[in-house]
Amino acid sequence: MQLYEHQKQALEQTKGFNKVAYYLDMGLGKTFVGSEKMVQLGSDTNIIICQKSKINDWMKHFKDHYPKIQIYNLTDKKQLDDFISHDTAWAGYPGATMTVGIINYDLVFRRSELLQLEHFTLMLDESSQIQNDTAKRTKFILKMKPDNVILLSGTPTSGKYENLWSQMHLLGWEISKELYNRQYVNWVKVEQDGFIHFVIDKEEPYKNVDRLKKKMRDHGSVFMKTEECFDLPEQIFIPITVPKTKEYNTFRKKGLVTIEGTELVGDSTLTKRLYSRMLCGHYNKDKLQAFKDLASSTKDRLIVFYNFNAELDALQRIAAELERPISQVNGHVKDLTAYENEEDSITLVQYQAGAMGLNLQKANKVVFFTLTDKSELFEQAKKRVHRIGQNKTCFYYLMMCKDSVEEVILETLNQRKDFTDYLFEQFERDSK
């Protein structure tokens, strides 16, 4: 397998480490670096934990590049049993066949059999998936007993160092969460609705950052940005602004509105935030028309990111009216046939299912029909087309409702922050 120079460099930098983190920007080929490191470590038994949508991609990668390695899909109970049996019978014996078991984050904590295994290599693809140390997946993974660890991520914490602790723990940095937070994060006490809680200082969120990065490198972390390795094409962001609807204004004022026969009740911060976003999406006929106009203006491939199923339905109807071939990636379907074969295809991608991992560089035009509220998903969505092999300027069309919550969401995402309930409540106070 032929590696790029930056991939060889990453492996060379971690030559003496058995626990490593490859924080390589999207498109720099973390898959190849991670799999090659796994082979170099030479464990008989290996486990890869990834997103559900990436299982088949990982299986294909090993079959294509490492045909002698035996691959198991651990989402299948029989294959899981065979994988465990093979480890019990052969691991550690000379001549044992190298095995790789692949499973997704949402299922791994339900496979208690994996806690029996020892002396294996554990690889986490998109290791930022374990940034919440109270989540079931994270607790389970931290209980596993690997000898070797490989972490792969393009945006390990979306620029938020407070969420790094669980990953550093896996790399062998024995620092308590409390001490980590004291040394590297600036927390401030705030009172809200009579309750005291701590938030990160907006002006100066972190401290001792140089020391933190040095400690991370000391524990096998490698950081690489795309611009350090390749000259990629320019990225151009084009806002497409449409007016708010009267229903949006009514809902923002009263917290209640009926639209298209559906009553939207904002009786909590969560529902207010959710419905405010929806009213800027498929409920906004001006935005749907603007999307139709945009799609009509080009016969090039379009990649369209959306949030909700109702948005998918509306976008599919428009694509069908325009007689455009449709591909889609969401929690139920991953069909890229039209994208692969039709130059005028429209590919509809739900953020949660497709913002990470997909290579969509045949296209150079991306439409954000609505915005995600997660910084990491926004950054990774942009990288689906802006990656190694892309030789065209990348255009990103940001469809925005003027003077709405969407403008605040975009401002927040551009600061590499999530748009949280707390920020929405602040937006509500500022809007009064």
Show which residues each predicted segment covers:
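Conserved pre-motif I regulatory segment
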Residues: M1-Y23
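Walker A/P-loop
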Residues: F17-K37
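Conserved Walker A/P-loop ATP-binding site and its immediately adjacent core
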Residues: V33, S43-D64, G159-N163, N307-A310
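Conserved P-loop NTPase motor "coupling/switch" region that bridges the ATPase
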Residues: T45, K68, D81, S85, ...
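Conserved helicase ATPase core of P-loop NTP-dependent helicases/translocases
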Residues: I84-D87, I303-F305, D313-Q316, A320-G354
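Conserved helicase/translocase motor-coupling segment
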Residues: E227-E321
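A conserved SF2-helicase RecA2
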Residues: D373-K432
